[in-house]
Amino acid sequence: MFTEAQNFSIVQTELDKVFFQRFDYDDTFPGVAHATTAEIFKPVETTHAAWIQSINKGSGLFPAVGETATVPLSTPKVTNKQTTLVNTYAQGIDISKQLFDDNMHGVWENDVRDFADQAKNTQDFTAFGLFRLGFTTALTADGQAIFSTHTLIGGGTQSNAGTVALTPTSLNTGIVNLMEQKNQAGVISGATAKVLLVAPANWKHAREITDSALIADSGNNNVNVYRSALGLTVWTSHWLGAAAGGSDTAWFLLAANHGFTRLIRQGLETALTDWRYSNNLTYRYQANYRENYFCADYAGSYGSTGTA
């Protein structure tokens, strides 16, 4: 016997089918990054409402010692604590019972697809805010902008920021900066650039620089080392450009040891309230997830405003 409870389950199943097909489907061209792109935002799961991270200064290089000499002691240090609170993101839409019952899929399915799009857009907008605001108000644990000059725990400073527009020469400057970056103990890390992240307006130029067989923007026939040796992956997002409050000229390099993190407390979940509990014969379909994003340390990252 077909029951009302079964009917309710069918309604939620139909809504979830449309929602998650849209939310999980990536119909963009290759190279478009999202909050779920692990090369850019390292996923970390938590069971708490907040995440506390701190920056560590290691021991530094080993000194040479004599045969029976006392082994020198180096004391690691932890400081610059930063707390990231998990945010809850939620939204709901009303769907008329009659609209659903009459099987007017062209209407309610479009509403649910848009609902899924906005869930993904919210994730991406929030995540790439670390880069949009990386020269100003998005801070590392030391209280400085992500892309700026940082005071090292062991003394001295390290800059991971530039101002020059993206060219083969400036890209090399960024690559060298990553390779020669000093860690908190003042030791050169030797990080290798893996990701080049740009706004859509700079995507074509970035691909020409990194993918051309010969050096881009040049009349000579030298081999393009960015393609033949380095293997940079170029990523873009429409949440980086001026249209989204960012910059069309800014560009970023990331190494494997970068600190951009996606903190996940709860993945996307949906819920449906039956029309019987409304006063206007409507279903209420809701979705929510809990997460946040942070970058605690400058290491493994380089950014240029591209304004010079």
Q: Predicted regions: what is each one?
A:
Residues 98, 103-110, 117-180, 229:
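Alpha-helical scaffold segments that mediate packing/assembly in large oligomeric complexes
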